[in-house]
């Protein structure tokens, strides 16, 4: 397997945690210290990578674990 290619899809379920915490995307972005545009890219799954420091800040702001917001779905072959 090439290092740049995944055999599946990594999905960010930030919307679910935002709803549970009654928090807006803008409020989360401010707490994390990134732009709303960049948070939107993460939320929509268009990001190619995420820094651990950003993931840490998101988890702290949402009071959750990484597994609460990240899901892996394998490709069906």
Which residues does each predicted region cover?
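The alpha-helix within a helix-turn-helix
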Residues: 18, 29, 59
